Structures are given as C-alpha cells and as structure tokens.
Curated annotation (Swiss-Prot), chains A, B, C, D:
Miscellaneous comment: Reaction proceeds via a redox-elimination-addition mechanism consistent with an E1cb-type mechanism. This includes redox steps involving NAD(+) and stabilization of intermediates by Mn(2+).
Role noted for this protein: Hydrolyzes maltose-6'-phosphate and trehalose-6'-phosphate. Is involved in the catabolism of alpha-glycosides accumulated via a phosphoenolpyruvate-dependent maltose phosphotransferase system (PEP-PTS). Is also able to significantly catalyze the hydrolysis of both 6-phospho-alpha- and 6-phospho-beta-glucosides containing activated leaving groups such as p-nitrophenol and does so with retention and inversion, respectively, of the substrate anomeric configuration.
Biological source species: Bacillus subtilis (strain 168)
Listed result of changing residue 359 to D/G: Loss of activity
Enzyme Commission number(s) from the entry: 3.2.1.122
Documented activity regulation: Cellobiose-6'-phosphate and 6-phospho-beta-D-glucopyranoside are not substrates but competitive inhibitors of GlvA.
Listed name of the protein: Maltose-6'-phosphate glucosidase
Source lineage: Bacteria, Bacillati, Bacillota, Bacilli, Bacillales
C-alpha cells in the first residue's frame, strides 16, 4: 500500500534555516513522502529570496512536490498536515539588542537565556499564537512541530493560552549534544543510545545513557566530559569558535553535579561572569550570525535563483534537523519513537510544579507524546529549575496581563541578573527597544532609589 | 556473538502452574536461552511430584540445561539471574477458606478480591519477603519477577518493607483480556495493539487501544464489549464456565464507565451481589481448581515420571505465560518492551497517592521499568481506587504492626463488605482460620454491639 | 461608639426553623444588634404563616427592628449585610421520597447521606446558586451564611460554580455533639473546649479536645463514648428517640477508630444495615418531622398570629443555632473566633484532594475563614473520605453537565449502595420523582443486564 | 489557685543578649512566674562574667528565684520546663570571618544571609542538636524555644535529624518590624494588629494587616513604606545607622512586589550589590558588634558584679524579646496566642515543598503550634523561596553527609552568589576558616578551570 504523503507549511519561511531544512526534507522523502511544501512568512521580500532557491531545489530533486511561498495565512495553512515553525519575531536585529542591552550592565546577553531570552519570549508569544490560530482555523487536524525559540517561554505560553492545541515543542540542543556524545563514545549514531534526561528547555541534565544492550555509558562519558567537555578527541565536523567554547565549558558546568551530564546552556546560569567576559557588548553573537550565516545563505539563494540551478550551491543539508522528520513520522506513522519533548509536567517529575513545561523523554505516537516518568529530582536541580520556571511563567503572565511589575519580577528572579536595580534598568531599556513588538505594559506603580 | 544464557529458579516449584511454565520456557529457548533451571519450594513432597515431570521435559527437549529441585534456599538461590515467583502460602486449602468464610456472611468470596484477597495477602507477605531476602543474600544482582497473588498487596508490602529490592510485580489478567481483545478485533496477536491502561492490580481500565498505524480501536471494542463483554464471536479456545461468566459480565462492568474498557475483576466490586448469588459457599472456585487442574496436573506428572516420557502427557505449554519471558528478556537484553507492570506511582498518575502501587504501561529495560505518565484520572476511578488502595495499604500496615484494628479498618473500607459489623465477624473467623499463617495480631481494644 | 447594627435576610423564611432562629437572634441583640430583618421564600402562602408569628415576636421584643416577609428577590436582598440561608428545595414531601425510594431497595434512606443526600443535593444546587446570585446582584458586599443541607454537596457546588462568592458553609451537627461532650465532661459550655477536627461535612472525626488549660479531655470522652456513645449520664434535655439512637450508635462507630471521636452521621456509612433495619420504608424521618415539628410550628404560628401575642407560644428559642450569630459576629467584628467551617482544602489536609471542601477548624475574621492546618490524615479516614468526596464531586459534575452517567457513578461509589445494579434502579426512580426539580439529564448510553 | 512557676535554662548563657533577656523575664514574672533560672554555656570564663550581673539582678528583683550558671549539661538541663536557646557557635570572631570572606569576592557578607549564613549554619547544627539531646535526656517533657540563628538552617536540621523533638523555632525580626509598623500606624502595640505572613525565615512577606475591627491597614502601611521604608515619621527609639539603612531599604525591596510588605532581610537577596557597596570587608557588622554591644555588655556586667548592684547599670530590659515569654506562656497556659513560627509546611503553603520549614502564623497552645493555612503563593515568591529553601536543605544535607559537593551546590544556588566559580572560591576559604567547627567534608571529585 503506497505510503500516505504529506502537506507541510514552514512558518518562518524567510529564516536562514529554511534552505537547509528543505534540503533535509528532500533527503528524507523515502521515510517521509511530501506532496505539498509551502513557505509562510509575514516578510514577503525576505521570504521570496529564500523561496527562489527552494523552488530550484524542489524542481531538481522532487518536481512532483507542489511548492508555494506565500504571506497569505489562508493559502499557507489550508490543507496542511504539519506546520514546522521556526519563526523569529524581530529577526536578528532585535536579537542583537536582546544581547547588547544586558551586556551594557555586565549581564549575560544571550539569545534565549537571561534578559535576552525574556525579551525574545515577549516578542515570540504573539507570533506563535497567531500561527497556531491560523493552523486551527484552516487545518484543524494538523499538528504544529514548534522549534522556535525561546522554546521554554513559547511552550509555557501555548500551555496556558492554548491548552488544547495540537502543538509539540521540541529543541535541537540535546540532539546536537547527543551527536557529540556518540562521537565521544565511538558510536555511529546517537540513536544507539537510550537516554534519561530531565529539565526545562535549555536547562536540563542527562542522568542515564545506555547502549542498546543496556551497558552504562555514563562513566566513560563523565570521564571524558570532566576533562574535555563535549569536544570529541577527533572532531567529526569543525564548529565555530563560540560553539567550541560552549562545548568545552561543559567541563566546568558538569563539575557542579558530577552525577549528571549537563545541557550546555547551563553555562549562562552557573558561569554568567565568564560568559560576559568573553562577550563584546557592541558585537554579539547576533552580529556574527548576520555577518556569517545570514549573509552566506542569502547570497547563495540569490545565486541559485539567478542560475536557476543548485549546481554551485554550498548550502548543506541540515541533517542535524532530521529530528523534525523523526517527530513528524512518529505522529504520522505512530512509530512510538523515544524523543525529548517539552511537555506539561503533570507528575512526570514527581517533586516539581505539575504545570511546568519540562523537557523529558517521551514515547511519541499518533496521539502525541506519552511522557516517561522521571521520579523525584535532587534538591540542587529542583532549586535551579523552580527559580528558572518562575522566570518563564512570570514572563508569560506579564505578556498575558500586560504587567510591567511581573516582567520586572521575572528579571529579578533570573540567576543571570545580579540584583533588582540592574533588573529594572535592563527592563526599562528593553521596553523602549521592543515597543513595536511587545504588548504595551501598564506603568509600574513602583520606583526604586 | 553467542547470546548469554541464564539461570532461573522458580519459587513455588510445587505449583500446578510450574509444568506449563517450564514447557513455555523450553519453547522460548531461542529468544531466552537457559543454562540452569531450579525449582524451590518449602513442601518437598509436593514439589518432587512436579519436578519428576519437569525433569523428563528438560531431558527430552533441552538436555544441556542443568535442572534441580530443592527445598534448600542456599542451593536454590545461589548463582541465579532471575527468580520467577508464583508462591501460594497455605495452598488451595486456605484459598477455599478465604472464599467460604466471607460467603457465610453473604459477602464476595474470591481469591484476590474482598476479604479473601486480604486474608491471602496477610499470608503471602511473609512468604514473598522471605524469598526476596534469599535472593538478595545468595544472588544480589538477580531480579525477582513476581506474579504471585494477591499482587497488589504483595507489591505494596515490597514497596514499604523492601523499597530498594530488584523486584518486578506483574499480573497476567490484562494479558489474558488483551488476547481476547485481539481475537475480537481479528488481530493475530495482542502485540499488534498499543494500549494505555491504569489502575491498581485487578482494578484498572484501558483508556486507549490503537493498532500499529495509530488507528483507534476503542470504538469497535466498546461496541462489542457493550453487547458481549470479552467473549469473541468465535472463541479461539474454550474456557471454563466461571471464566466465561466473568468475560461476559464485563458487559455490565463497562456500562459503569462507557469511556473505558474495564479489568474483569471489577465485577467483584461493582456487582458483588451477582457474584455472591452464583457462588456456592460450600464449594467455591478453590474446590473446582483442586478437583480440576490440581488433580489433573499431579496425575499427569506422576504418569510422566512413571513412564519417564512426556509422550502421553496432556499438559499444555502455558504460552499465555510467555509475558514472563518478555519481562525477563526486557531486563536481560534491554529490549525496551512496553508492558503493564505494578510500580510505585510517584507521579505517573498525577492526582493519585504518589506512594500507591499502580498498574501502568512501562518501558522495560536493563535498569528496570520506566513508567509512562497517565496524567489526571477522572473522579469515578479516583474514588474507587483511593478506597481500594487504602484497603491494600491498611492490610500491609496491619501485617507490619500486627494490628487487629487496622485489619478491621481494611475490611470496613472494602467496597465488597456491606458494613463494619459484617467486617468484624468475617475478620474474627479469618483470624481463627489463619492462625498458622498470619502474624499474631494484638487484641483490638474495641467491641461493637 | 454605638455598635453598628445589621440587616439580615433569612432565605427559606417558610422553614420550620425560622421562628426558633428569629427568637435566638432577638435573644442575642446585645452582641449582634439588628436594624432590619427580612424573610424571603418562593412559597408565599407558607412563609406568611411563619412571618405572622415572627412579626409578633419582633413587635414584642424589639419593635425598632424593621421587619418584612417577601417573595420579591430585589426587596429581600437589597441593603443586606448577611443572608442566613436554610432553604429546602422540594420541602419535606420530597425529603420523604429521598428516604423512601432507597429503602425500597434495602438501602439507607436518609436526608443527607447516601442516595437521599445525592437527590436532595441535585435539588438544592440550583436553589442556593439562585440566592447567591440575588445577594451579589443586590448587596455585593454581603456575606451568605449557609447551613442549608446537604452542606457538603452545596459547598462543592459553590466552590466550583461560584469560586469567588462570599459564602460561608457551616453545619450545626458538630455544635450539637460538642454540646453533649461538654455535658459528659461536666463543663458549662462547649466553648470551654478547644477542638481539632477534620473530615467532610457529616463525615468527620475529632482528634483532640482540650480544656482551656490544655488538659487532654479525649481519654475521658473516649472512655464514656465507648460505653454510652454521646449520651450523657444525665440528659440536660430529652431528645427524640431517633436522635437518641443516633447518639447511642456513636459507641459502635467510635470502635472503628479508637484514636478519634466520630461525627454521628458516619453510622449511615459504617452500619448502613442497622440503619435500614430500624427504618420503615413507608414512614420515614421526614414523615415524623411533618407530623411532628412542622405541624407543631405551623399550629403555634397560626395561634400567635391569631392572638397577636406570643403569650401562649410554646416555640422555644433555638439557642443551639447561636453558632450562626457567632459566625456573623466573627465577620462583623473580626472576632477571630475558632469555628468548624466547610472550606476548600487547599493544603489544610496535606494528603487529601486540594480542591475538596473539608470541614476543619478555622479562625474567622472580617476577611472570612483562615483554615488551621490538619497535617496528614491516617489511611482509614483517607480511604473513606476520598470515596465520599468523589460521590459529592460527581454529583455536582452531574448537575453541571446534566450527566445521567456521572450521577449513576456517584451512586455506585457511595458506601451505602451495595452494587451498581441497585444504584441504577434507585437512580431511575429518583430521576422520575425529581423531574420537577433536577436539571433534565442526558440519556445514559449504557444498559446493564 | 497559685499559678505554676517554671524552671528555665538559657542555653548560650555567655551571650550578650542574656542580661537583657533575664531582665525581661524578671519584668514579666507576673504573667510567667519562674522558680529556677540557669545559664548554660560551654565557655565558662565568658559565661561567668555575664552570670555575675544576672545574679545581682535576680537577688535584687526576685530573690526567691533559684539561680545557677553551669557548663555541666546534666546540671543545666535537669528539672527544666523550657530551654531558651540563643547559642552562637564560634562567637563573633567566626561571624567576622563569615562576613569578611564573601566580601573578599564582592559577595554579600552577612550573619545569616548568603555564604555567611551557610557557614554559620554549618557550625550551629551540631551545637543545637547537642543541646536538644541534653534536654531530651535530662528533661524529656521540656520544650526548646529556639531563636538561635541562622533559624532557617537550624529549623531544617532539627526537622530532618530530630523530627519528633519538642522544639519551637521562632525569629524576632518580624516582631521588630511589626513594632515599627505599629508606630507608623499610630497604634500602641503591634498586638493590635492581626497579620497574615508567609515565607522562609528571614525571607518572607506580610500579605494582610488588620486592626482589631478588621479594617485593612495595608494601604496606609504600603503608602508609608513605599516612601520611607520601615522608618516611622517620629522614631520611638534611635537605632544604629546600619539598622536604619536596613529599615529605609525596605522601600526598594517593597517595590519588587507592591502587593506585600517584605521582611527586611530580603534586601540581601534583591539588592546584594548595594549591600556590598556599603560594607567594609575589613570591618564588618561583627566588628561593630564586638566593639559596640559586646564591649558594652561585658564592661557593664563586670561593673555590676564588682559593685554587687545594678544601680549604675545601663543594661536595658530587652522587652523586644518578650515574644519569648509569649511563646512560653502559650505552651504553659494553652493561650492559643497567634504567633509567627518556623514550622514544617505540610500543606500550610499549598504550592510549596511540604517538607520545607516555613514561617507562617500559628495558633500556639500546650500541644505546640497549629499553623494557619496560607493557600497558594504567587510565582515570584515561589521562585525565590524554592531557590532559597534548596540552599538551606542542601546545607543540611551537606552537614549530614559531610559532602563538599552539596555545600558547593548550596552556594551556587544562593541568589547572593554570582557564579559557580566564586561559590567555589568562597567555599574553599570557608572550609579552611571553619576547620575547627565544621564536620570534615569529603574531598570534591571535581575541579573547575
């Protein structure tokens, strides 16, 4: 019986990630056949440049796939099985401000952690809800596979504001780290590992890693990580310097709890000062990306569109993103794949807020994710996670209630922010910088000396 | 690489189930190779009659397996990978009293439900702990696969009194009912179904059943069960009348909650009067088994031992018990099989006592079971389960504290017992009947008029 | 400074309790000055006969109090500080059916316990919500002091359907039993006792009783109750036979848990058979009341109205109801009185459903009740209470969702109902009997053989 | 009937607080009669200088009180009704190091908050347990009234390591702040206020303050505090500059949550930088106290002992400490006084760790404290409190398990410590400084770059 083929819309078509993901989808048509692929964005000019290249890729590799790029929600979201969402409200320009404003006050300036993540979240909530509503309006049976950042705040927002929506929140960081673990262990693929992991998004720990036979791989990994972090002795693939620092820093982050292996983003919470020291407040990661990947991708796309051929294209298949296909297939074919998803806790972590959105192993089938219980977590992780989940929940409360006070409280609570005064100064700058993107907040009744 | 082969001891070697299970093990040597098989029992005379036949089976079908039957704990439990426990403290004679005493007062008289289950539990706790202690003394790395009844009370006792023991509590009733569901659905095996189920042992509900592609099979099953119970239109295999009544009664039990499919044992709690009406206080199920299966198995074993051949044997392979092999393989080879096990709740059912032993789907690997979260259960099931788990916990508290009062409270709480007076009368009879098996209870300070 | 005086409306003016309560209010004007007293009922003819007498009482004892009896909600609920609610939807006639229908099937027939309480609850919810809405419409700052039965179901309904309403649910049974305890102990008033108590309404236990100096009075009380129940050696006041049986039966109920002293209503759950045995299905307590108190009160009221004098009145001050004044004063004057109220659990009982309405000691002030924590309750009480609270919650869910199925589940769960079939038969009779009072339930999809 | 009089031992007799407290006790003999007063300390030389003066006070004011100062536990703790504990293990010298070491790294250096509190806690646990064990050995019916700091860590330690001990943990900070609130409101005493408050010790918030009639005093207080902090317009009593800064800083701390009024210690967590800025790493509060109060008290005591008269004594009655008498009287006479105590949460705060030691209003009687439920707390306070309670619990776990790793985790988690590296550096210095007082910790397996 010929496998059913699917209709996909990529929300955030103008993203620099779109070409690599389209190539990845075209590379997995065997397992995941596609009949229709659409790009949707609210920035027509930007999306058309990306779409030009994707059109060439598809005509060359799978001409029978119906392809369209549109800014019309009805066209984009009608007759769709899956929405693959990687939107970035405010694009890199706003990300630069997210990073630079905190650094002005000596505070971590990062895309999803600390004040930057809060600012980015306050922009993203409206965007993700909008797309979710389009999906439910035009394709009520569709699923949204959301890997838009900051996933933690977006996931809490969809839990609170769209509790019954068919949205799966997933993050690629654990995938990337597990790829490195596999290299460190000499395995051919991370899929040879069975892992137990828990935390919030960008804020978690591996507690058990076995091979297929059930042998415990943690001792070997811990031994390696305690010396080299997540840098394999022989790098399969060269990475940018800043990523290399991150994987090396895992060494110190792991020292804080030798019983586990940490998600690398914890560096921003446990060693914020080190992060600030190596940041340039006037030229942050966002600037690197704009000058690096964004420039590269758009120049390549223009060239492919111009030459109506991908022959000279240097754009690589983003196979690292194949977890999106795994997730889509799990829903489509009830595969029961074991994947880390961001889901409502509801008892999975026994001694943690049942309404928190936690990142835990799930068995994914056509009915969605079945979280696997974690049990009780140690006090160190509970203390860190309760603090951080309160930041995320207060941010969503602030967005929903247009509350300056609650957003200030979110910043005060963040482990990356040293005190309430700096929190207030950063917030006032962020309000100003985001006035075109955030809901208008009520005026805080309180001043501090 | 030649698969590792295992050493097994069957605790309760003298059980009538042993021959069928040994035949089943011999039928599954391909997937689960065995190097040594021992029977252990504290009733030498009874075990030797069973062992005689098993010896013949093994010599005929797998002569290289080292076989022994012993009443010496050290011999039995040394160099063992798995203990397969199906003990019955007090044998069928006491089960007959468990059933007859309550019936004397018009109350359900059943092996594991109501006062009978409480009495049986009070006998079994000591027996299971004893075996567990032998295992940990002589083979500290071994696992106990316990399907001794009453599994709910035994599981609560091991949780409370041996919290760190490597014991897996499992029950074959859901396996049996799922076999029938598969027949009703026209599937070749229950393993083609992916199920979601929750409850206490002998006290649970299926909430979702899909085929491999994720299609919802519940509507079809509910339609069938609401008319015929768990009786397929064409019975694959004739069953005893009393089992047939049970599978038919599922029809009425299911009516109490049309959203789910019930475990058949719920009939004793929702329709106790019907159960009592069709029981004969002087000739209960235990008597049927003694006159039926027990007599049959022992005569067959004597014959096989006499003829030193299984040629004329009518003892069938108990393939229904192959779930035991599935469980052993999951531990041995880290298969990650999805099975219903009785595990500590600890958040799996979000709105239920975290310390309750609940029967839920688990992913089973070499580290043991990983329960899959159930989420929040409806008020009807919560009310029934909280009442019943209190019966089970009070029984274990009564055993541990030798408390007549707590055992009376357990009986008062049972849905099968109409009032505190009858609970008291039954308890006093059971105390008398079990004085050789139960711990000696303190004298209750209270009388009732 | 002259104490503020209050405006009261008694909802359920036509109740036989109204005259005694009015006399009690007039007897407590010193502590609780009243400027305006209104009676409200939806049965004008019945209320006018009661109002006639009350008019005489007020003119004789406190002529400056403005008095009115009305069936007009706006008039009744405008300019009101307190609504004192003792409504009985369906009056005694329906209560008779509540009691007789279950008895037909050998099941407890009682006003607030078992099927009778469920039926009464299904009538009362709408009535209490209606009054609450009138109060909030016409006197938004007022408080409703609700002692309408069945208080447990009414309290759960107001929690779920009017979560922010200023309603205090209180019951007089503990007050009555504590009065008797005081007599047993030789104290002049129950107010010399400091008690710790927990449970659901009509379903609780005293765990600690001290005198003012902190001496433990439990041993002496337990000693007495274990022999005589709640019957003091010398009765201060003769009670009706049925009440006497109830207070005597406490002896057996207490035996089920010698560590506590029980609420007498537990007799219907622990000794339902004894209750049924002494009931006459054709002449229940409701009939006794109609023939007894109801006839007496209305004849007395007619006489007082006729004679325009209370001189020959035999209607007594209902000082037992002075707890209503205590509660009103606590709100009015922020007295911080310690009283048993029915409040949302929310942690008061640590190991019990946080959304359950539980009866626990509270400190009552102008902001309402502050529940005192109970801590963790034993397994016996938890099992009983979880079962019973599920009955109450399912009844309110059934009312809100018009669900025949959920009401059947409520009856199945009740400890007083022996099995699902009898539950179904009783339900079908009750549906028929209450078609003028209950919401119209959907048709249950299920039949049982 | 002549009131019973009591035997008291003050543990930490050599404390500078002892004279003021003894004078306070002598000033309250009417409400709390004392027959025997003993001082106990393990520093004889220091205690004798204090005892000399106390001996004079007692002979002058209540000669019939039996007085003794001893370093012998049996003598001190025999025939005792109450142990009043204000011990300081390591005295002010170690407190100076607690404050100076963190300041070396730009981190808050304070007696009970941040690294200083953790270091002080690691010294105090052993000391308080020792005294508790003496009390239970020699006067098993006695109660310990503990106001030794750091009360939060000491309370968690006694909860975990002595769960059944009769110890009441109380703190005087809320008392001091409520005194100031009363002045701000123009009330004669804080006892005219009924408060609702929750938090951890030195980490809480007032949520409701009423006068006796139930009028809401919060608006007026919030208005004042948002401008002047806790500084009344006319100071009843001049305070030291550092205390004045603290009460003024409440203004900024309150801005973080305008719905509540904060405990002043929150300044160290919300404005750590401001605290560090005004600290002199070489001359901290401990030095001020040694040079100030300690020198003053010991010189005064020497003079009183020399002159065998208190005539020229400038030592004031520490009436601020009369809360200790209130607490003792509540136990002794079952007064049911409403006081803030540090008790096991166990549901009092519904959405917070049930095993946390929380500071909440309690009704105190002869059976000990009955916590009043708080209900659910907002996300901001929950985030802050979960982080801080994890610091406290990890400190006690580190003490009990002699774990360097867990103590490092406690420091990492503290909101006052900027990152894991500084946490590590501070810890290594504190280990060195406290080697005579802390248990010897295992060596951490981990290093950081």
């Amino acid at each position: 019986m010929k496998k059913k083929s699917f209709s996909i819309v990529i929300a955030g078509g103008g993203s620099t990630f779109t070409p690599g993901i389209v190539l990845m989808l075209l590379d997995h048509l065997e397992e995941f056949p596609i009949r229709k692929l659409k790009l949707y964005d609210n920035d027509k000019e930007r999306q058309d440049r990306i779409a030009g290249a994707c059109d060439v890729f598809i005509r060359e590799k799978a001409p029978d796939i119906e392809f369209a790029a549109t800014t019309d929600p009805e066209e984009a979201f009608t007759d769709v099985d899956f929405v693959m969402a990687h939107i970035r409200v405010g694009k890199y320009a706003m990300r630069a401000l997210d990073e630079q404003i905190p650094l002005k006050y000596g505070v971590v300036g990062q895309e999803t952690c600390g004040p930057g993540g809060i600012a980015y979240g306050m922009r993203s909530i409206g965007g993700v809800l909008e797309i979710l509503d389009y999906m439910e309006k035009y394709s009520p049976d569709a699923w949204m596979l959301n890997y838009s950042n900051p996933a933690a705040i977006v996931a809490e927002a969809t839990r609170r504001l769209r509790p019954n929506s068919k949205i799966l929140n997933i993050c690629d960081m654990p995938v990337g780290i597990e790829d490195r673990m596999a290299q460190i262990l000499g395995l051919s693929s991370r899929k040879e590992m069975k892992v137990r992991y828990y935390g919030l998004n960008h804020f978690g720990w591996w507690t058990s890693i076995q091979d297929q036979e059930g042998n415990d791989l943690m001792p070997k990994l811990k031994e390696h990580v305690s010396q080299y972090g997540y840098i394999p002795k022989t790098e399969a693939e060269a990475v940018e310097a800043s990523w290399n620092d991150t994987f090396a820093k895992a060494r110190d982050v792991q020292a804080a709890d030798p019983d586990t292996l940490p998600n690398t983003y914890l560096q921003y919470y446990l060693f914020p000062d080190d992060m600030v020291k190596k940041s340039n407040p006037n030229h942050t990661r966002a600037n690197e990306v704009m000058e690096g990947r964004e420039a590269f991708i758009f120049s390549q796309c223009d060239m492919i569109t111009r030459e109506q051929s991908s022959e000279n294209s240097e754009i690589k298949i983003d196979d690292h993103a194949s977890y999106i296909v795994d997730l889509a297939r799990a829903i489509a074919y009830n595969t029961g794949e074991r994947m880390l998803l961001i889901v409502e806790n509801n008892g999975a972590i026994a001694n943690f807020d049942p309404t928190a959105m936690v990142e835990v192993p799930c068995i994914v089938g056509s009915n969605g994710p079945e979280p696997i219980t974690v049990g009780t977590i140690p006090q160190f992780q509970k203390g860190l996670m309760e603090q951080q989940v309160s930041v995320e929940k207060l941010t969503v409360e602030a967005w929903a209630e247009k509350s300056f006070q609650k957003l200030w409280q979110a910043l005060i609570l963040s482990k990356t922010v040293p005190n309430a005064r700096v929190a207030r100064l950063i917030l006032e700058d962020l309000v100003e910088a985001n006035k075109d993107f955030w809901p208008e907040l009520d005026q805080s009744p309180t001043r501090i000396s």
